[in-house]
Structure formats: structure tokens, C-alpha cells
């Protein structure tokens, strides 16, 4: 694999020499940093099993190497890397996999380790959505996830990835993560804080990542991280699990932040060792039981992961002074809900008791039941999935609901050819050789739902959202 030149400040190299355990070679560290990062993907098990995914993609000649800490994760090598971007493959467009760095799969593995099965989870810094979608898959779309993102521009990307992966149990918020300890005290069974950091571990992806690095900046970032972990710890219920992670390598933003929390709440913080998380985890294990992953250990990004349990309640923070405002939705009455459910089933959309129908004007939404306890405590940017808009003749079913709820074995499902599917993703109407009979047609490709079409004569009218329409090379050019 080709080398690339990474910029290293002298003070950073000095700090790394001090931070690196004697069992590791500093020369190996430098050599690993100069190698470009291996690509990796995670199969979205909400859509397809790992076995079926491997069978589906076998004809492509991809080399898929299992990632030890994530059963559905693989390093991927392709002969035609430049011919077709991974993000333009049919399997990516339909949400069958997520392009995710291998080491960033570690925090969620830690969150669910040892049979942990939380029902209400918060992802404090969620965009672009790799970990939120991984959590949702581990929860099998059950329970509820609060996915928060402070950056307004990244909330849209977060929602797009959640929608593409067919996830229905997520509520999105857009806050500074420091508000949650006050706003929702002791409300969550598990919390992932993948904290904003100095990014020292990402030099293999971005050789200039350390251009603005300084020890002073690290100290400022660590101060913010202490405030974030304190807030998250307050939002965690007694007995709950908190995973703290970063993609940086210095001890100040990693071990020291966790030790600060333990010193602040000595009777309430218990570190849960991660040495048994996967075979060879002990190679990255610190004396506290954390994983401090230098890039040469597993040939991935540098990363840090700590897992802890809240063993008892801690004093509450002062009550919030802000007002959330009125919640603009109301629950749909049982009788009407039954009619809506029946109409939705007619086009192949089904849901279980984890989701409940709510209404706002002519909009129908499905919210995860587990999030209802948070209504009135935080303001949501987006909640659950938009099911439909009502109109005089019935319902206008929404694309995100089709992707999350459709069952491809529905009687009105219509399988497209590769060429027709590509036309669909380009936002064009499709003219199949033999048009389906039904007026509302569940469009599938590779037996995966990709949208809902209206049949008009022999034409299938495209309803693919304009913001998702693709141009450039798509999958048939790779056939």
C-alpha cells in the first residue's frame, strides 16, 4: 500500500513517546501512521443478514476481512476501487451497509458487551451517524435512541444516514451536549459519548490533521470533554452504562478525563474492563481496563474506548431555567390508528408496538414509545419517521417510511432490473416491460425496498426524494 506524508509537530512526537507503553514500538507507530487507512464497512443487519450480504456480493470479487470486534464489520478491498465509489453501489444506496472506520465500531461493541441490552440509549455526539445506526441495529430497531448533534449543518447528514438504513427508533436533537445532565437526569440505560477531540488518531485518513495541533489546544478540549462526560453521567440512570471514546491518542483527553470523573464521583463510578471484548483486546488494554488503540496494534485508526457503570445516584444539577415549548403532535385515537394501519399494510408498510401513531395537521408520524418520557423535557429536531400526509383521496406515503417499514414480500412489490433501478435512483420514471397491476407499487431491487411508485398506464411515476437523486456513475457501469 502506498505511503503518504503525515505532518507531525515535534511536541506531539514527544507526547506520544511518553504515552506509548513499552510493549509497543515507536518506529512501528510512525510507520503505521504513514500508511493510508484500510477501507471498512459494516453490514446493516436491520436490512440483511451477514451471510446473505456475503452471498449477494460474492460475484463482485470483493475481499472482505472480518473485523475482530464487530461481527458485521469487514475491511474491504476492491480491484475496481476507482471505477465505482463504494457509496454508489446498489447495496449502499439501499442501506445494506454503512461505510465506517473499523476502530469507530469499538465503542458500540463496548456499549453492548456482556449481554447489556439497554432500552433507552443516548448518542451525545451522533453525526454523521455511523454509531447511531450501529446502535439501532444492535437494538433491532426496538427501544429508543436519542441521537444528538451540536453542529446544525451535520444534523441533516445524520438524518439522511438514519433514513437510508431504515431506522425507526431514533429521535434527533440539536444541542450542546452539556445540557442533558440538567434536562434529562437519570433517564438513560446507556449513553455513548464519542467526544469531540483533537483527532490525533485520524492522520492515516487526513495527513494534515495535526496542522493546528498544540498542547494548549489539547488542554482546552479536555476541559470541554470533562463537562460533557459530567453531563452524560448525570443523564445516566443508576446501574446504567456509559462508554466514553475519542479518535485521539494523548492521555489528557482520554484516561485523564475518565479518572477525573471517578475522582469527582468516587462512590458512583465503576470502570468495567474491556480486556475480554474480543480476542487480542489485551494488546490495547490499559491498567485501568480501557482500550488505548495505537494505529499499529490492529492496523486501523488510533482510538480510545472506556466503559463504566453508574453504581448509584448522584446529586442532581440545578433545574433548567428554559422552557421547551408546546409539543406540536397529538396521539392518534385507536380507531383511526387501526384504519391507518390497515391502509399502510395494503402497500406493504407494517410496524410493531414499539412505534405509536401521532398527528400534526395533515401529517402522520410514528414515534418510538420509549422516547415519550422525554417529551416536554427536550426539543426535538426530528422524531421517529414521517409515515404519510393525508389528503382527500387517502394517504401520501413517505419515502423514509417505505425504507424503514416495507416488507419486500408484499403482494404489490415489484422487482426492478438493474437498469430500471439505476433510473429510479436518478429520479426518473421507469417503464417496465410488463407493468404491475396495482396503482401503488412497492419498488424493490435485490429484493430490498427502494421506494413507492404510482402506476400511470405502463409508467411507474418516480417518488424518490429530490435531495437523494444521484448522478454520475452508478452500479450498472460496474456490471
Swiss-Prot record:
Gene3D superfamilies: 3.10.450.720, Vaccinia Virus protein VP39
Active-site residues annotated for this sequence: 247 (nucleophile)
Catalytic activity: cytidine(1407) in 16S rRNA + S-adenosyl-L-methionine = 5-methylcytidine(1407) in 16S rRNA + S-adenosyl-L-homocysteine + H(+)
Cited PANTHER family: 28S RRNA (CYTOSINE(4447)-C(5))-METHYLTRANSFERASE-RELATED (PTHR22807:SF30), NOP2 YEAST -RELATED NOL1/NOP2/FMU SUN DOMAIN-CONTAINING (PTHR22807)
Any one GO cellular component localisation term in the record: cytoplasm
Source organism (scientific name): Escherichia coli O9:H4 (strain HS)
Keywords on record: Cytoplasm, Methyltransferase, RNA-binding, rRNA processing, S-adenosyl-L-methionine, Transferase
Positions of S-adenosyl-L-methionine binding: 125-131, 149, 176, 194
Presence of the UniProt keyword Methyltransferase in the record: yes
Annotated function: Specifically methylates the cytosine at position 1407 (m5C1407) of 16S rRNA.
Family label: Belongs to the class I-like SAM-binding methyltransferase superfamily. RsmB/NOP family.
Pfam families with a match to the protein in the record: Methyltr_RsmB-F, Methyltr_RsmF_N, Methyltranf_PUA, YebU_pre-PUA_dom
Transmembrane segments: none
GO MF: RNA binding; rRNA (cytosine-C5-)-methyltransferase activity
Localization per Swiss-Prot or TrEMBL: Cytoplasm
KW Methyltransferase (keyword) present: yes
GO biological process: rRNA base methylation
Protein name: Ribosomal RNA small subunit methyltransferase F
EC top class, as a word: transferase
EC number: 2.1.1.178
Amino acid at each position: 500500500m502506498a505511503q503518504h506524508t503525515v505532518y507531525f509537530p515535534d511536541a506531539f512526537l514527544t507526547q506520544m513517546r511518553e504515552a506509548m507503553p513499552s510493549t509497543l514500538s515507536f518506529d512501528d507507530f510512525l510507520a503505521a501512521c504513514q500508511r493510508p487507512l484500510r477501507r471498512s464497512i459494516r453490514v446493516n443487519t436491520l436490512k440483511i443478514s451477514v451471510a446473505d450480504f456475503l452471498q449477494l456480493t460474492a460475484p463482485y470479487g470483493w475481499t472482505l476481512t472480518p473485523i475482530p470486534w464487530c461481527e458485521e464489520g469487514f475491511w474491504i478491498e476492491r480491484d475496481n476501487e476507482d471505477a465505482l465509489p463504494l457509496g454508489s453501489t446498489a447495496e449502499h444506496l439501499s442501506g445494506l451497509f454503512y461505510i465506517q472506520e473499523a476502530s469507530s465500531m469499538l465503542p458500540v461493541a463496548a456499549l453492548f458487551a456482556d449481554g447489556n441490552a439497554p432500552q433507552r440509549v443516548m448518542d451525545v455526539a451522533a453525526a454523521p451517524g455511523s454509531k447511531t445506526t450501529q446502535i439501532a441495529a444492535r437494538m433491532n430497531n426496538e427501544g429508543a435512541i436519542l441521537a444528538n448533534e451540536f453542529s446544525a449543518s451535520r444534523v441533516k447528514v445524520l438524518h439522511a444516514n438514519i433514513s437510508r438504513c431504515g431506522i425507526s427508533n431514533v429521535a434527533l436533537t440539536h444541542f450542546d451536549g452539556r445540557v442533558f445532565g440538567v434536562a434529562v437526569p437519570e433517564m438513560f440505560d446507556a449513553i455513548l459519548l464519542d467526544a469531540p477531540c483533537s483527532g490525533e488518531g485520524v492522520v492515516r485518513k487526513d495527513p494534515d490533521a495535526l496542522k493546528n495541533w498544540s498542547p494548549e489546544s489539547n488542554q482546552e478540549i479536555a476541559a470541554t470533554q470533562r463537562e460533557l462526560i459530567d453531563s452524560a453521567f448525570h443523564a445516566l440512570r443508576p446501574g446504567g452504562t456509559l462508554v466514553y471514546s475519542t479518535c485521539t491518542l494523548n492521555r489528557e483527553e482520554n484516561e485523564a478525563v475518565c479518572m477525573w470523573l471517578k475522582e469527582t464521583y468516587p462512590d458512583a463510578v465503576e470502570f468495567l474492563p474491556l480486556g475480554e471484548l474480543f480476542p487480542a483486546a489485551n494488546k490495547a488494554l490499559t491498567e485501568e481496563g480501557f482500550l488505548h488503540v495505537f494505529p499499529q496494534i490492529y492496523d486501523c485508526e488510533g482510538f480510545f474506548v472506556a466503559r463504566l457503570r453508574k453504581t448509584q445516584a448522584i446529586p442532581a444539577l440545578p433545574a433548567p431555567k428554559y422552557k421547551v415549548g408546546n409539543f406540536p403532535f397529538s396521539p392518534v385515537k385507536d380507531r383511526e390508528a387501526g384504519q391507518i394501519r390497515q391502509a399502510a399494510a395494503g402497500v406493504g408498510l407494517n410496524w410493531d408496538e414499539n412505534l405509536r401513531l401521532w398527528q400534526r395537521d395533515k401529517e402522520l408520524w410514528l414515534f418510538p414509545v420509549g422516547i415519550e418520557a422525554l417529551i416536554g423535557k427536550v426539543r426535538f429536531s426530528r422524531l421517529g419517521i414521517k409515515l404519510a400526509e393525508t389528503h382527500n383521496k387517502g394517504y401520501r406515503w413517505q419515502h423514509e417510511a417505505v425504507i424503514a417499514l416495507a416488507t419486500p414480500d408484499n403482494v404489490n412489490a415489484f422487482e426492478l432490473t438493474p437498469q430500471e433501478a439505476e433510473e429510479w435512483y436518478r429520479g426518473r420514471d421507469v417503464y417496465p416491460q410488463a407493468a404491475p397491476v396495482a396503482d401503488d407499487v412497492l419498488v424493490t431491487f435485490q429484493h430490498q425496498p427502494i421506494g413507492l411508485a404510482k402506476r400511470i398506464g405502463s409508467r411507474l411515476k418516480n417518488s424518490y426524494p429530490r435531495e437523494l437523486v444521484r448522478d454520475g456513475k452508478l452500479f450498472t457501469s460496474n456490471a
